[in-house]
Amino acid sequence: MEQCGVLPEFKGIAMHDCWASYWNYPDIQHAVCCAHLLRELTGIDENHPEQKWASAFIDLLLEMKKVKDKAVEKGKDFLSYYHYHKFDKKYDELIEQARKENPLPETTEKKRGRKKKGKILALVERLANYKVPVCLFIHNFNVPFDNNQAERDLRMIKVKTKVSGCFRTEEGARDYLKIMSYVGTAHKQGYNAYEAIKNAITG
């Protein structure tokens, strides 16, 4: 994460999957990828149908996305007070419901220290602690619902390893990532990949 020097100097909005290491960058405004949350919530809903809050939370996230998409179609860059209040209230209600369904395990005298949480409770606490980053996409319309584009950018790395087997050296892997990052950024900004590489070489 430190290798290319991007995140340490970054001052914008970074969307991620809530991996703990990302929160070590206090100067970044964080946004949580809702596609990752939907996958986790769907897993809980399918494997633990008694967890009624999970399916309700899926519905909430999708409704938030739907309402935002409609607002964007109408040329707006914000939601109505009604919708902000509705989503905020429903979010808190579902967190409360989830906590009631998944209370913290009691500690015993033999086991001291931090209480161990299961995957379900860990997700509940994440949703509670990072409510603002989760909901940022409806407050700032420049923030997407998910970071699927970033994940698509990474698929070429997987294709490369499948075709070539692996990178021979760590330095070679770093060079490959730098080149792909440069080409990907150029493409997003509307530049031809060939011209971008030629300009980088010729200065």
Question: What is the role of each PLM region?
Answer:
Residues 1-203:
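Catalytic center-proximal scaffold of phosphoryl-transfer enzymes
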